[in-house]
From Swiss-Prot:
HAMAP family linked: MdoD_OpgD
One GO term describing the cellular component: outer membrane-bounded periplasmic space
GO molecular function terms listed in the Swiss-Prot or TrEMBL record: carbohydrate binding; catalytic activity
The name this protein goes by in its record: Glucans biosynthesis protein D
Higher taxonomy: Bacteria, Pseudomonadati, Pseudomonadota, Gammaproteobacteria, Enterobacterales
Record-linked SUPFAM superfamilies: E set domains, Galactose mutarotase-like
Annotated source species: Shigella dysenteriae serotype 1 (strain Sd197)
Length: 551
């Protein structure tokens, strides 16, 4: 299975798939001597027209890889590409009175080879005009671009767009769509982190993963003083097409996106991923194997959180496994799920470049009935922080056949905290380490005689204090091995309880161990469910080596 390798921050290596297939619907025109950057002929547009466009496009053959870029763009380095700036005086909504939002476009070049068309829409008349590429929209600075090669290239298109919000107009963007169908947003820290995608196809199958492209965007002209905007997108790939509507609310402390899509399958699809998101987890409190660095933790997200259709809340800490892992969690009409970054303490990261303590969480809230399916979680081994190695999405139970049509509605919350949380006790942190000794010994003058792995899970909130006098009972289920030395410890600094147990193997198997735990009081659950996957070492590694030199 081939995986994309995006350069974090600039998203510099976009996946290569599909074309727009809409050239016959929107003709080009000569540049207009008009302050409005939209220079194409007017055409009627609304979401129903886009749906028909996507439906008709699915009846035609996919047009394949993008055409070659001019040499001056194809050979750019990331540094050169990032030095190109859009001219803020020619921004999309520059002429809107009392504008609180503005949009700029990304230049084609380097790994961004798929032409993306941009249109400006008057929401009152439903008339759209294309915005054609021309070099004067950009400042090339020290990029070394030979602009003579770009003359007359009005159909070159753009790579994507980003949106700014007052008072940081033209300075710090809050929303970005760039590369394939990837997009991101920030909270009030202005720190980008994980990404979402329009669609995921064959992420974990025996087929090559397919990366659909957003090939065209239509922007409703933003209203004066508004902090909400609407953009429509056409998605295209070898297996499917789609019409998307994004209503994006740029609030003070978060960005909320209302997403509606209509999908049209060209081919049978083995694995269709709805509301996919991509993140990075190198190491954290539970996984220290790859943390030979000055930074205690390195991750964009620390857990997958799920609010199941039956009301159960699940916390699944993320891993950086030595072998690729894919887990599918069955559900029926899920209430929500997301990849969260809940630890906001700088001292836990000590990173003044990545600022992982400021990175947003992403929560998906279905807005229509999604039916039966699974929440898929893929964890890919990584040696550092430059590669996204976590993928999560909803996979419908129903198999996708050529000619099938689907419609999904959901809301995305980009924020420090998800909009909802479990009313019961919640998992704060998961830690692992050497086991087989009494707490506080750690380990003393000699190592334990028998090898074991210790797990410590901290719970906070809910009714833990009220339950404590009645008795808190951890309910632990393991797919293999045994849990011993189970302890319940009150942790005053967090005003919560730590459930600690040692895992002992009962076989030589190195298969992943699925762990499940929740807290119970007098027969009732009083916490969310903790799920974890542990990877036992080989039998010959299950021993403690004392390598001290005493003389």
């Amino acid at each position: 299975m081939d995986r994309r390798r995006f350069i974090k921050g600039s998203m510099a290596m976009a996946a290569v798939c599909g074309t727009s297939g809409i050239a016959s619907l929107f003709s080009q025109a000569a540049f207009a001597a008009d302050p409005d950057i939209a220079d194409g002929q007017t055409q009627r547009f609304d979401f129903s027209i886009l749906q028909s466009m996507a439906h008709d496009l699915a009846q035609t053959a996919w047009r394949g890889a993008p055409r070659p870029l001019p040499d001056t763009l194809a050979t750019m380095t990331p540094q050169a590409y990032n030095s190109i700036q859009y001219d803020a005086e020619k921004s999309l909504w520059h002429n809107v009175e009392n504008r609180q939002l503005d949009a700029q476009f990304f230049h084609m070049g380097m790994g961004f080879r798929r032409r993306v068309r941009m249109f400006s829409v008057d929401p009152a008349t439903h008339l759209a005009r294309e915005i054609h590429f021309r070099p004067e929209l950009f400042k090339y600075n020290d990029a070394g671009v030979d602009t003579k090669q770009l003359e007359g290239q009005s159909d070159l298109g753009f790579a994507g767009f980003r949106v700014f919000k007052a008072p940081e107009l033209a300075r710090r963007d809050v929303v970005s769509f760039l590369g394939a169908s990837y997009f991101r947003a920030v909270d009030d820290t202005y720190q980008y982190g994980l990404s979402a995608r329009g669609l995921a196809i064959d992420t974990y199958t025996d087929s090559k993963e397919e990366f659909p492209d957003f090939t065209a965007f239509w922007f409703d002209t933003v209203k004066p003083g508004a902090t909400t905007f609407t953009v429509y997108a056409l998605l295209d790939s070898a297996s499917i097409t789609g019409a998307y509507k994004f209503t994006i609310h740029c609030e003070k402390s978060q960005v909320i996106m209302d997403v509606e899509n209509h999908l049209y399958a060209r081919k049978d699809i083995k694995q269709l991923g709805i509301a996919p998101m991509t993140s990075m987890f190198s190491c954290g409190t539970n996984e220290r194997r790859m943390c030979d660095a000055i930074h205690p933790q390195i991750h964009d997200s620390d857990r997958l959180s799920m609010w199941r259709g039956n009301g159960e809340w699940i916390c699944r800490p993320l891993n950086n496994p030595q072998k690729l892992q894919f887990n599918a969690y069955t559900d029926n009409n899920p209430k929500g799920f997301g990849l969260l970054q809940l630890d906001r303490d700088f001292s836990h990261y000590q990173d003044i470049m990545g600022w992982y303590n400021k990175r947003p969480s992403l929560w998906v809230e279905p807005r229509n009935k999604w039916g039966k399916g699974t929440i898929g979680l893929m964890e890919i081994p990584t040696t550092g922080e430059t590669l996204d190695n976590i993928v999560c999405f909803w996979q419908p139970e129903k198999a996708v056949k050529a000619g099938d049509e689907f419609a999904f509605q959901y809301r995305l919350y980009w924020s420090a905290q998800p909009p909802v949380h479990c009313p019961l006790a919640r998992v704060m942190a998961t830690r692992t380490g050497m086991g087989g000794f009494p707490e506080g010994w750690a380990p003393g003058e000699h190592y334990p005689e028998k090898w074991a792995r210790r797990f410590a899970v901290d719970f906070v909130g809910g009714d833990l204090k009220a339950a404590a006098p009645k008795g808190i009972e951890p309910v632990i289920t393991l797919s293999s091995g045994e849990a011993k030395q189970i302890e319940i410890l009150y942790i005053e600094p967090i005003d919560g309880y730590r459930i600690q147990f040692d895992w002992y193997p009962t076989s030589d198997s190195t298969d992943p161990v699925d762990m499940r735990m929740y807290l119970r009081c007098q027969g009732d659950a009083i916490s969310e469910t903790w799920l974890y996957q542990y990877f036992p070492p080989a039998p010959d590694k299950r021993q403690y080596v004392d390598d001290r030199v005493m003389s």
